[in-house]
């Protein structure tokens, strides 16, 4: 199964675009108090050699990279939860720095898909008080629509799926935060951004069309992401380690 590609002349981001986007996000200081949880799903049925030891001793790079770039973009309240370390994690009960989480980012490989679905469903149990739910990782990149209308009730699913790398997430956050009023829940700002059509201009996203209904959902795919050419634009990979949730039940 091969993913589509952009034209050779349009594969990469313009040099400097990544760092410029992080700098613009640093200027949006009203958003820096958002509580962001990055959850890495893990299915314990997949624990087997040769990964028996490494799976519980190594923090995956993907979620650490997200924390690195969010920290470099000015966000202060970040936490990475690894389900292999904290198997009973429930987003609906999660509190970060004394407050419920505002954004839940779920990352999963294909073999860990089922627990990732349950993380999304659990967050949706909060109803109107639920966080903005974003899905990503290999599972989401290849089968993004599996995260929409997951049931058992209508409307249960992720708000948006990133089918690209970290820059796609930065562009999404920037677009939503520009539409966000002071003190407004970020999920409300996302809904308004989605209805405005702004998200259609960000390659690498999949979300439900605002004109679709729960009984006939229609997904919008904004196209193939652009890739980062100069990896020196990435921040130092240290903040991700500092915001790891320690192992506990």
Where do the PLM segments sit?
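Helix-enriched interaction subdomains in cytosolic or periplasmic regions
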Residues: 1-20
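Short glycine-rich His-centered loop
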Residues: 16-56
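Soluble or luminal CAZymes and related metallo-dependent hydrolases
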Residues: 17, 58, 62, 112-115, ...
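Eukaryote-specific, low-hydrophobicity, charge-rich regions
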Residues: 37-42, 70, 78-79
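Short catalytic helix/loop segments, enriched in acidic residues and glycine
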Residues: 55-71
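Radical SAM [4Fe-4S] cluster-binding motif and immediate context
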Residues: 58, 216-219, 229-249
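Glycine-rich beta-alpha loop elements in corrinoid/cobalamin-binding modules
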Residues: 69, 77-224
